[in-house]
């Protein structure tokens, strides 16, 4: 009987904590139908993108805080083993197609421990985009967890940062997000 009461009390405490944190995290305040009625994992931030030096596909060091100044950039933190990361690639390809001529650039930052060879194989894959097999149409940079955290990565994949034309991080994306919600956020920043 005592064991059952302890379990019941723990369940009540956990339930209360989940309820509290669900409604008090920064991304829950802007819940939206664009994310299927679920709390929107897109939160507002306002800070400069710090110097973030990564290895480009051409094997050159690139500082993301300078290389894309004047463009809206979505930095996608991913790993090849992350199924949510793989699932969002077609959306990222579509965003690049739709907004690329408006000064928008997707930049993927691989934070795999699997190594460059595994990432190269992943990048060469074809993805189904509206019934058409398409390659990634954006650069994939090699990074580390330390580099990603310096840029603003808070842990958990998939994850991303939306950076405005002035080099300021304006949106942080935590976890899987509905394509429509992310597209809406990108469109707003591109129009600014």
Predicted features by range, described:
Residues 74-75, 106, 160:
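Hydrophobic beta-strand anchors of alpha/beta hydrolase catalytic cores
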Residues 123-165:
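Short, internal strand/loop/helix patches
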Residues 71-73, 77-81, 156:
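Short pre-active-site segment immediately N-terminal to redox-active cysteine/selenocysteine motifs
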Residues 156-192:
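Thiol-/selenol-based redox modules, centered on thioredoxin-like
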Residues 77-94:
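Conserved redox-active cysteine motifs that mediate thiol-disulfide chemistry
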Residues 51-73, 96-99:
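A short beta-strand-turn-helix
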Residues 103-118, 133-145:
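Thiol-based oxidoreductase modules, predominantly thioredoxin-like and allied folds used
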Residues 1-51, 171-172, 192:
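N-terminal targeting signals for export/organelle localization
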């Amino acid at each position: 009987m005592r064991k059952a009461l302890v379990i019941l009390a723990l369940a009540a405490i956990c339930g209360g904590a989940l309820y509290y944190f669900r409604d008090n995290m920064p991304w829950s305040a802007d819940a939206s139908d664009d994310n299927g009625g679920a709390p929107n994992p897109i939160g507002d931030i306002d800070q400069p993108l710090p110097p973030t030096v990564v290895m480009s596909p051409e094997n050159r060091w690139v500082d993301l805080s300078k290389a894309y100044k004047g463009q809206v950039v979505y930095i996608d933190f991913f790993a090849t083993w992350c199924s949510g990361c793989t699932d969002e690639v077609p959306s990222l390809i579509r965003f690049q197609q739709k907004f690329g001529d408006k000064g928008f650039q997707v930049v993927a930052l691989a934070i795999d421990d699997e190594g460059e060879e595994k990432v190269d194989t992943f990048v060469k894959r074809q993805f189904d985009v509206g019934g058409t097999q398409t390659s990634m149409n954006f650069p994939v940079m090699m990074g580390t967890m330390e580099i990603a955290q310096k840029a603003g990565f808070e842990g958990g994949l998939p994850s991303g940062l939306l950076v405005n034309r002035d080099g300021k991080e304006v949106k942080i994306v935590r976890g899987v997000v509905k394509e429509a919600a992310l597209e809406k956020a990108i469109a707003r920043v591109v129009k600014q």
